A protein has these predicted regions:
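Transmembrane beta-barrel wall of Gram-negative outer-membrane proteins
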Residues: 1-105, 117-122, 126-140, 144
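Face-selective signature of the C-terminal outer-membrane beta-barrel domain
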Residues: 79-101, 125-267
Length: 267
C-alpha cells in the first residue's frame, strides 16, 4: 500500500534530516534510496534506546498489567415469609448482582504489525472490560396436609456476561478505527418448578420418606459483537472477503498485512 503514495518517499527523507541520532553515513543511505522498497530494509535498523530517549519514555512504559485487574461489585438480596394460615405460608427470596471488571492484555509494541502507529505511535495496552449481571428469584408455598409436608416453588435465574474492549483498535481500519468495541455477550437463563412431598416414618426414628417432581427449562445464547470488533477491512474500508488478493489488504510500512478485529479479544 505504501508504494502507492509517491509523496511518502520525500516525506521520509525530509524527516530523516531532523533526527539527530542518525549519523551521516546512515543519512546518506536514506537520501540515496529511490523507492519505498529500498527504504524498508534501511529503516529496520535498531535505534530502540535512542528513540526511547527522544520520546521521553522508558521500558517500564511498555509493561503489561498482569494480575492487576480491577473489580467493582454491587449486590442486593431479599428474603421474605408470609404465613396465611396455621399450617401454610408463602415465601420468596432472590437478588440482583452486578460486577464490572477490567484487565489488561499483552502490550502491543509500536514495532508490531498489530499496532497502527498512526493512531498509537508508542503502542498501547488493550483492556478487556466485563459487565456481569446476575438475577434470581424464587417463590413458593409450603405447608402441611396431615403428616405430609408439601412445598411447591418456582425459581428463575439469568446471567449476562458482556465484553467491551477498550484502549485498542482494529488495525486493518487504519485511521478510521475506534478505540472501543462491543465484543459480544454470553447469556444463560434457567427456570425450575419443584413440587416436593415428605413425611416422617413412624417405625424408624429420625427417618423420612420423600419424593417430588421437577420441570426445568434452560437457554443459552452467544451474541456477536459489532462488526468492527471482528471484521478485517480492505484498502477501501470495506470488509475483506475470504480469498481476497494481497493487493486488497492493508499493510504497514514494511509490507506486513494488518490484522482485523479488535486487538486482544475480537467479537
Amino acid at each position: 500500500n505504501v508504494d502507492a503514495d509517491p509523496r511518502l518517499l520525500g516525506l521520509i527523507k525530509g524527516y530523516a534530516q531532523e533526527v539527530d541520532y542518525f549519523d551521516s553515513s546512515y543519512l546518506s543511505q536514506i537520501q540515496g534510496a529511490t523507492s519505498i522498497a529500498a527504504l524498508q530494509p534501511l529503516l529496520k535498523k535498531d535505534f530502540t534506546e535512542q528513540e526511547l530517549a527522544y520520546r521521553g519514555l522508558g521500558r517500564k512504559d511498555f509493561n503489561m498489567h498482569v494480575g492487576q485487574s480491577s473489580l467493582l461489585g454491587t449486590q442486593f438480596f431479599i428474603n421474605a415469609v408470609i404465613p396465611f394460615s396455621q399450617h401454610w405460608e408463602l415465601y420468596a427470596f432472590g437478588g440482583q448482582s452486578y460486577r464490572y471488571g477490567e484487565a489488561g492484555g499483552f502490550f502491543r509494541r509500536p514495532n508490531q504489525a498489530r499496532t497502527f502507529t498512526g493512531l498509537h505511535p508508542n503502542g498501547y495496552l488493550p483492556k478487556i472490560t466485563t459487565d456481569i449481571q446476575d438475577s434470581s428469584i424464587s417463590a413458593g408455598i409450603r405447608g402441611e396436609v396431615g403428616k405430609w409436608h408439601i412445598d411447591l416453588s418456582n425459581t428463575f435465574g439469568r446471567n449476562e456476561f458482556a465484553y467491551t474492549i477498550k484502549n485498542t483498535g482494529n488495525t486493518s481500519l487504519l485511521f478510521a478505527s475506534p478505540d472501543s468495541f462491543d465484543a459480544g455477550k454470553l447469556r444463560f437463563l434457567q427456570n425450575t418448578i419443584n413440587l416436593d412431598f415428605s413425611r416422617p416414618l413412624e417405625l424408624f426414628e429420625k427417618a423420612n420418606i420423600s419424593f417430588g417432581l421437577e420441570q426445568r427449562h434452560e437457554a443459552y445464547s452467544t451474541v456477536a459483537g459489532e462488526e468492527l470488533s471482528y471484521a478485517t477491512y480492505d484498502i477501501h474500508g470495506g470488509v475483506l472477503p475470504l480469498g481476497a488478493p494481497s493487493s486488497q489488504k492493508t499493510t504497514d510500512f514494511f509490507g506486513n498485512s494488518l490484522p482485523g478485529g479488535a486487538q486482544v479479544l475480537p467479537g
